[in-house]
Amino acid sequence: MTNIHNHKILILDFGSQYTQLIARRVREIGVYCELWAWDVTEEQIREFNPTGIILSGGPESTTEENSPRAPEYVFNAGVPVLGICYGMQTMAMQLGGLTETSDHREFGYASVDLQATDALFAKLNDNLTASEPKLDVWMSHGDKVTRLPQGFQVTGITPTCPIAAMSDESRRFYGVQFHPEVTHTKSGLELLTNFVVGICGCECKWTAENIIEDAVARIKEQVGDDEVILGLSGGVDSSVTALLLHRAIGKNLHCVFVDNGLLRLNEGDQVMEMFGDKFGLNIIRVNAEDRFLDALKGIDEPEAKRKTIGKVFVDVFDDESKKLTSVKWLAQGTIYPDVIESAASKTGKAHVIKSHHNVGGLPDYMKLGLVEPLRELFKDEVRKIGLALGLPAEMLNRHPFPGPGLGVRVLGEIKKEYCDLLRKADAIFIEELYKADWYYKVSQAFTVFLPVKSVGVMGDGRKYDWVVSLRAVETIDFMTAHWAHLPYDLLGKISNRIINEVNGISRVVYDVSGKPPATIEWE
């Protein structure tokens, strides 16, 4: 079996908003990497045994007395090191150079003139018409290196940054003041490939097929002949987790699908058809709609609704798990960003992956071992694995759907009538987006039920029914978002269909709020 962790890159996080992008780019190249806090110990680095190290950017200033520094062992480990932005500055400072706050801060696009073609910049040139090679890059820095450490040479400059890139090829140390991990840097992926593959010598073994093979082997080793229970929602993470476990242990996997009455139109039937009929999984469907709706009566505050939905789910799932007396393991679809965010919420830092770490917080009374086959993977990697396992692309690439489901898309108190109306209206919205080839042009689209009534006219009669709002946004990272400028004729068609086909809705509005100031979801 291929050892997909044999060659690996260690990324030390100094707090940049782009740090996870570095890891995703390295994985995209085909090499495993992990993201750790900047203040790891020498012992931890030795144990990880990286093939190369990348120092991320960060918001601090190296000119400040207590600003973060890389562990000294980083520069004594005998492996290549790449410093990005702040990572380059701390490398320079720690190896004997100088940095200072720049009079001309650089934020946004810049053109770097390459002064020397070292291994990092081999075959890179974004401007073939210029006499000297240039790179179009993305800058985001206020400090700059003003004196090189001994043994380094300048490899790139800009008009306001005399040391925009540097290298000491004898020690395989490299620094760039720009961000190769962002797509705005045209040749950024090629530069990172030069470092990871060309300089570090990593083999590209991190592929979907190899990841599946490794995950299946590790599941078999962990659980043996024991039985495992999994809460299957039909979402990407739990679906891929289910198929990996099914491939590893077959009928020893028990999937529990809790139909809470807060799902999209026909979603429960689709989950059963996909995983029960097509893939042959051992799946139990629990119709718990009444239980959820009863618990939600009289609750209109969003956070209280979320907590109630979460508690009822745990209670329902626990009831089912007690019926399966031979189960010894609980599987979860935890992914790598969950691990990073969980660690950060507790310590303010990203931490080392630790096996059997319970990100979600199991109730104390559920005495089960934990299986998390996706905990090393980013979302885009999970989707690639899902495709390789046979899941349809349209399912894997669906827009995000909140954990509480329609519970946070029905504003105020949740009632079955409201959910039924919303399901039908939302299905029409999504259907028309697909027909008009707009579904994949927007990042997320959904319908919100507003608990207010509005006067309308239907034929010769007057109607007084509910209002729904359409929401469609465009975003890269979901941290900020713009409302999608859908064509007026498309919006008109969607509105007309909803009002005419969904008895109980008299008015359709379109949400044109950005994030910020609004959030993407209404609750």
UniProtKB/Swiss-Prot annotation:
Organism of origin: Actinobacillus pleuropneumoniae serotype 3 (strain JL03)
Boundaries of every Glutamine amidotransferase type-1 domain copy: 8-205
Active site residues per record: C85 (nucleophile), H179, E181
Entries under CDD domains matching the protein: GATase1_GMP_Synthase, GMP_synthase_C
Gene Ontology terms: cellular component: cytosol
UniProt protein name: GMP synthase [glutamine-hydrolyzing]
A GO term, aspect molecular function: GMP synthase activity
Catalytic activity: XMP + L-glutamine + ATP + H2O = GMP + L-glutamate + AMP + diphosphate + 2 H(+)
Species classification: Bacteria, Pseudomonadati, Pseudomonadota, Gammaproteobacteria, Pasteurellales
Pathway: Purine metabolism; GMP biosynthesis; GMP from XMP (L-Gln route): step 1/1
Keyword annotations: ATP-binding, Glutamine amidotransferase, GMP biosynthesis, Ligase, Nucleotide-binding, Purine biosynthesis
Purpose of the protein: Catalyzes the synthesis of GMP from XMP.
UniProt-listed InterPro entries: Class_I_gatase-like, GATASE, GMP_synth_C, GMP_synth_GATase, GMP_synthase, GMPS_ATP_PPase_dom, NAD/GMP_synthase, Rossmann-like_a/b/a_fold
Gene3D superfamilies: 3.30.300.10, 3.40.50.880, HUPs
Coiled-coil stretches noted in the UniProt entry, renumbered to this chain: none
Binding site for ATP: S233, G234, G235, V236, D237, S238, S239
Keyword Ligase: yes
EC annotation from Swiss-Prot or TrEMBL: 6.3.5.2
Oligomeric and partner information: Homodimer.
Residue span(s) of domain GMPS ATP-PPase: 206-398
Leading EC class: ligase
Domain of life: Bacteria
